[in-house]
Amino acid sequence: MSGNTLGTLFTVTTFGESHGPAIGCVIDGCPPGMGLTEADIQIELDRRKPGTSRHVTQRQEADEVEILSGVFEGVTTGTPIALLIRNTDQRSKDYGNIVETFRPGHADYTYWQKYGIRDYRGGGRSSARLTAPIVGAGAVAKKWLRERFGVEVRGYMSGLGEIDVPFVDWSHVHENPFFSPNAAVVPELEAYMDALRKDGDSIGARIDVVASGVPVGWGEPVFDRLDADIAKAMMSINAVKGVEIGAGFESVAQRGSVHGDELTPGGFVGNHAGGVLGGISTGQDITVSIAIKPTSSIRTPRRSITKAGDEATVETFGRHDPCVGIRATPIAESMLALVLIDHALRHRAQCGDVETPTPKIAGSAT
């Protein structure tokens, strides 16, 4: 398995399995001299960790992070930063019924056919448990981006199943387990999830992420375009089946006179491009949306096959999120931050001294 590293100059390599002794990552390329403690990382991990409400998996993991290297006297040294998160609440017996069968919608069948071996315990390497190290690395990236450029990366749930969640205010996001930016919708979301759990079924969600303060110029055309790398990173998150940047698929129905964001001396008029043109950041907010599929592990019996190819019926028993999207907001934020810090460093390496006579216009005309 060779696809475990994200990034070019700021790289993150994750390791571990859902029911192994620990999971973690190694960050390479973090600039030296930034203050960093385990508390800086833990605050982000606590936003993602399981067992925080009745609407998510009841697996109880503290997700306490340990910094093993790359930090001396509370400051990054420029050497690899190793983060470790120990697994403490594995319950592998819940997966005894799928040793010889494949769960529909999961990576069981594809991992088996590709590698000839699979860790059936909680999905092993393919588990969403492995998003915890991504959030840990994302905390490092967020801190550097915020301190160096004033970049803020924030996200929220904009839809759960058939329920749209209109944006009201960022202050609402941190006050409910759904990361909903609209407190008035939370009771409806709770009732929906309670009914879903009673039915033994699952549902998908939409997450929106916004990066504010990104300067013009980040991105490496043509094959390492900023939006291309964002899309790849987002599609690397478990259960993500779609990515939109800016207007996304709504662009199909828009005329050029509407979609093209006009430039004025006072700033851009509109942001249908989502803050990226030609694969390079415009200086506007970078806006990304992801579609997360329904959780494949459900109590409803589903048809499948055994390793021998015979018919089988699979009913999943473990502790699972009826909607993985509920905990996906900090994961999506982290992925965006990791792409941005990598491109910030790449831009600085090649074009950091470039100056033009053209003023940098505001992201939005007032």
UniProtKB/Swiss-Prot annotation:
Q: Tell me which CDD domains the record gives.
A: Chorismate_synthase
- Any Pfam family from its record, for instance, is Chorismate_synt
Q: Which GO terms describe its cellular component?
A: cytosol
Q: Which cofactor does it need?
A: FMNH2
The UniProt annotation places NADP(+) binding at R48, R54
Q: Its annotated pathway?
A: Metabolic intermediate biosynthesis; chorismate biosynthesis; chorismate from D-erythrose 4-phosphate and phosphoenolpyruvate: step 7/7
Q: Name the chemical reaction catalysed here.
A: 5-O-(1-carboxyvinyl)-3-phosphoshikimate = chorismate + phosphate
Note on cofactor: Reduced FMN (FMNH(2)).
The GO annotation for biological process reads: amino acid biosynthetic process; aromatic amino acid family biosynthetic process; chorismate biosynthetic process
Q: Which residues cross the membrane?
A: none
Query: Where, in this chain's numbering, is FMN bound?
Result: R125, S126, S127, N238, A239, G278, K293, P294, T295, S296, S297, R319
- Which EC numbers does the record give? 4.2.3.5
UniProt-recorded Gene Ontology molecular function terms: chorismate synthase activity; FMN binding
Q: Which UniProt keywords apply?
A: Amino-acid biosynthesis, Aromatic amino acid biosynthesis, FAD, Flavoprotein, FMN, Lyase, NADP
Subunit description: Homotetramer.
Biological role:
This reaction introduces a second double bond into the aromatic ring system.
Q: What does the similarity note say?
A: Belongs to the chorismate synthase family.
- What is this protein identified as? Chorismate synthase
Q: What organism is the protein native to?
A: Burkholderia lata (strain ATCC 17760 / DSM 23089 / LMG 22485 / NCIMB 9086 / R18194 / 383)
Q: What is the lineage of its organism?
A: Bacteria, Pseudomonadati, Pseudomonadota, Betaproteobacteria, Burkholderiales
Whichever gene encodes this chain, its name is aroC
